[in-house]
Amino acid sequence: MRLFIGRRSRSIVISSNNYCLSFQRLRSIPGASSQQRQLSKTPSVTIKSYPDTDLSSDSNYLEVKSCIFNGLLGLVCLNGDIYVAVISGVQNVGFPRWKLIDHQVRPSESIYKVLDVDFYSLENDVFDYLLCERSEQNYDKLIHEHPCGPLKKLFSDGTFYYSRDFDISNIVKNHGLSHNLEYTVDNQDLSFIWNANLASEVINWRSKISNEEKQLFANAGFLTFVIRGYCKTALIEDGPNTASITIISRISTESKQDTLELEGISEDGRVSLFVETEIVVTTEKFIFSYTQVNGSIPLFWESVESQLLYGKKIKVTKDSIEAQGAFDRHFDNLTSKYGVVSIVNIIKPKSESQEKLALTYKDCAESKGIKITNIEYSSSVLTKSPHKLLYLLKQDIYEFGAFAYDISRGIYFAKQTGVLRISAFDSIEKPNTVERLVSKEVLELTTNEIDVFELTSPFLDAHDKLWSENYYWLDRTYTKHTKNSGKYTKVYSKLFGSRVRLYDPLHIYISQYLKQLRSKYTFEKDISIFAGTFNISGKIPKDDIKDWIFPKSMSKEDEMADLYVIGLEEVVELTPGHMLATDPYVRQFWEKKILTLLNGPGRKKKYIRLWSTQLGGILLLLFMNETEYSKVKHIEGDVKKTGFGGMASNKGAVAVSFKYSATRFCVLVSHLAAGLENVEQRHNDYKTIAKSIRFSKGLRIKDHDAIIWMGDFNYRILMSNEDVRRKIVSKEYASLFEKDQLNQQMIAGESFPYFHEMAIDFPPTYKFDPGTKNYDTSEKMRIPAWTDRILSRGEVLEQLEYKCCEDILFSDHRPVYAIFRARVTVVDEQKKTTLGTQIYEKIMERLEGLDDDEKIAVLSDDAFVIESFEGSDSIAGPTHSPTPIPEPKRGRKLPPPSSDLKKWWIGSGKQVKVVLDVDPAVYMINPKRDPNPFVENEDEPLFIER
C-alpha cells in the first residue's frame, strides 16, 4: 500500500493494486440549507475512489516513502480535527493453518503483530515533516506532541494483531476454511475488533458501491480489523508428527472505555477484563481447536483500597435478587455464542466481603441453572498437582468436546459445544494457569482418539511456552492499565467515542437510483424444496431409500426439487466419555448415499452437497441443483445440545442459515426428549433451541423469510394403546391427531408458535419392529405415535405434500417428507451491475469539466435529475446530507395498557373474547384452510363436520 498527501487541496490518498481511495475534509455542503448545516454537526469527510494513475508524477501529490504501509485502520476525530490512521509497521507472528508441500510447511494464512501506526491529518501539514522523515527524535515528538500520540502509543504497544486471510475475531469453529473480505465484514465478532468504530464509516461506504468495485476494494487490501491480546504460532517439525500450535487471546471491547477496569457487571450484562483464548493445533491431516473464556465476576461489586496486605478488597453493591437480571443477560449472550456454559470460580475467599461475593455468585448461578465449580487452590498448587483441578472439571471437559476437522476428507468430525467461563479477581496468572492445564488435558484426550498423531515432548514444551508468553503479555497489558487507569480511560474514550461521517454523493446517488430501478434487475421465481426427516436407529443400511427421496410426485427428473434438506436422527450410538462424539464415516456414508441417488445414471441435472454438519447423533444435509448454487451465499450453521440438561449430544438441534439470492432461509433438524410424560421437557427443549440458536450479527431463527423445522420431536398420542392401534387400522387419523401432544401444544400456543403443519393423512411413524410393518410387539408395547414431524413458517413457503414412506423398514421409525414451493426474490447481479455502470456514465457526463467542489454542489442539488433508462421515467435523487434530517416528533397520546377485560387495539365497546355459535362436538375447524384467519378462502368452509 502506498500513501500520498494532496498539497493544493489537502487530502490523503491510499493506493494499492491500481485502486485509490481519497479522503478530504468537508467543511460544508455546497448549496446546503441552513437546517442541513445545523444538523450536520458530525465532522465529515468526502471519500472518492478511482483507478490508480501515476500519482507520483503529479506535482500535487507527495508520496510518503519513509515506511511501508500495511493497511487502513480508519478515521478518527480528535478535538474537531480528523486523521487517517494507517498501519506503518508489522511483524509476521502466526499461521494457524498450513500445508505440507515437498516436505516443507507452507502457511495458508498469516497473522501479523502491529508494531507502529501513523495518523495523517486532513486539516493541515503541521506534523507531515515528522512522518516523512523517520528518526528516533521525530518518533518521540509524534508520541508526545501529535494530538494522536496517545493512540499511536496504544496501537504500537505490541498487543494488536490482524490477518488478511484468517478471520481473527472469531474462533475457528465459527468460520469456514475459505476466506474473503465479504465474509469477514458479514461475520466478524465486533466485540473483539478494537478499530471497529474507526472503520465503521468505510464499511458503510463499501456497502453502497457496486459488486465490481467491491472486488477492486477487496483486492487493494486497505481495510484492516485488529484485535488486542496475544497471538503466536509455534511450529514443531518432527517428521510424521510435524504440527503447529497457535494461541490467540482476544480482549473484549464490550465495556468500551472500562474494558480493563477492575469492576463488576453493567445492567446490560457486560463485564470488564473479558478475554477469549483459543488454541489451534494443525497437523498434516487434522485441525483442532479449543476455546476458554475468563473475565471479572458478573455481579455488581466494586474494588476499594484496603489497608491489608492484599491491596484491594471487594464491596458487593447489589444482592443476588437485584443482580439476577444482568447476570442472566451476560450468560444468555455467552450461551448463544458458545453453547453450554460452566462456571469455574477461582477466587479463594480471603475476607468476609469475598465470602459474600462467592455466595451471591452461587445463588445467581443456581437460579439460572448454571453449573458452578469453586477452585480454591493457588496457582503453584495447581501447577504441581494439576489432577486436583482436572478431577473437578472432568465431566465438563468430556461433555463439551473439542472442534476437529479432517483436512484429507474435508469434513468436521467434532464440535466444541460448551465453554468454561473462568472468573477471577485482580489476577491474570491464575486464570492463565487453569486454562493452560485444561488446554493440555483436552489435547491429550483428543489425540488419544486420533491414531495418526501423538503428543511429543517438544510439542508439549512449545504448548507450555506459548501459555507462559500469553500470561506475560496479558499481565503486562493489565498492569500498565491499573498503574495509570485514568490516562488509559481517556485514551479509550477517544478511541471508542470518535465520530466521523463519510460523504460520497456519487455512490449515494447511484445506490438510490438502483433502488428506484429495482424492478428492472429483480424478479420472483418459484423453487421446489424437498424436506425429509428419518430416525435411522443407529443403522448403516444397505436398503434402498429411493421411495423416500423420490416420491411419486418427484419421480421424473424434471420434477426433482431444486433443494433437498435431509435431517437424520440417531445416526450413531453415542459412547459416553469420548471427546470426539461424532463418527465421520457415518456422515460421509449418508452424503454419498443420497448424492449418488440424486445424480443417478442418465440424469442431466447435477446436484452438489451445499452444506452438512453433525451434532452427536443428529445430522443435517443440504443438496442443491448445481445450476442454482451460484445464487446461494452466507451459509452458516449452529448447534445446540439439550440432552441431559445440555451436557450430552444425544438430544439437541442442528441449524443452518443461508440466503438464496435475496431470500433468507433457516433449516433445523432436532431430536427432543423422549417419553410419553415428558411433554414439559420437550417444550423446554424447544424453548432452549429457539432461544440459543443464533447466527452472525445476532440473527435468530425467527428473523428468516422461510423456516423449515423437522426431526424426531418425540411427541406422543394421549390415548390407550388399544384405541390407537384400532384407529390406525380404520385410518381415523383426524381422531388420533386431536390427541396428539404436539397438536395440543401448538393449539395452546406453547411450543412452535407461528409454525404450520400440514394435515397428517399417514399412519404414526413410531414404533415398529425393525424389518417389519408391525408396531412394537416387545415387552414395552409402546403406543404408536407421530414422533417424526416437519413444520414450516414464512409467507414465502407453500406446502404441497406431507407423507411418510411405509416400505422402508430397517429402522423402528419411518421416514417422513414434505414438499414445498418457495417464492424467492432473485437479484440479477449482472443486470444490476450494467445498470449501475449506465447510471455512473450518465452522471459523469453531467459532471464533466467541473472541479471537485462544483461536482459536490451539483450532486447535492435537490433538482438534480438524470435521464431515463429503458423507457423508465427520469429519476431524481433524494436530498442528501452527511446527517439525515430527523422527522419531527409528533405528540400522540398512547392508549392505556391492556387488561383481562380490555385490549388497547379493540375499541368501541367490543368484547375481548368472541363466542362462536358452533357445537364443538359436531363441528371442527377445517384443516384445509390457511391457518391465518385473515386469508380469504371462499372454496373451503371455516367449519366442517367431525
UniProtKB/Swiss-Prot annotation:
Residues 936-946 have a biased composition (Acidic residues). Residues 151-480 form the SAC domain. SMART domains: IPPc. InterPro entries: Endo/exonu/phosph_ase_sf, IP5, IPPc, SAC_dom. GO terms for molecular function: inositol-1,4,5-trisphosphate 5-phosphatase activity; phosphatidylinositol-3,5-bisphosphate 5-phosphatase activity; phosphatidylinositol-4,5-bisphosphate 5-phosphatase activity. GO terms for biological process: endocytosis; phosphatidylinositol dephosphorylation; protein transport. Residues 872-902, 927-946 are annotated as: Disordered. It comes from the Eukaryota. It is found in: Cytoplasm, Cytoskeleton, Actin patch. It is an enzyme of class 3 (hydrolase). Pfam families: Exo_endo_phos2, Syja_N. GO terms for cellular component: actin cortical patch; cytoplasm; membrane. Gene3D superfamilies: Endonuclease/exonuclease/phosphatase. Belongs to the synaptojanin family. Interacts with IRS4 and TAX4. Controls the cellular levels and subcellular distribution of phosphatidylinositol 4,5-bisphosphate (PtdIns(4,5)P2). Does not utilize phosphatidylinositol 3,5-bisphosphate (PtdIns(3,5)P2), nor phosphatidylinositol 3-phosphate (PtdIns(3)P) and phosphatidylinositol 4-phosphate (PtdIns(4)P). Plays an essential role in a TGN (trans Golgi network)-to-early endosome pathway. Involved in endocytosis and acts as a negative regulator of the Slm pathway which modulates polarized actin assembly and growth. Present with 98 molecules/cell in log phase SD medium. This is Phosphatidylinositol 4,5-bisphosphate 5-phosphatase INP51.
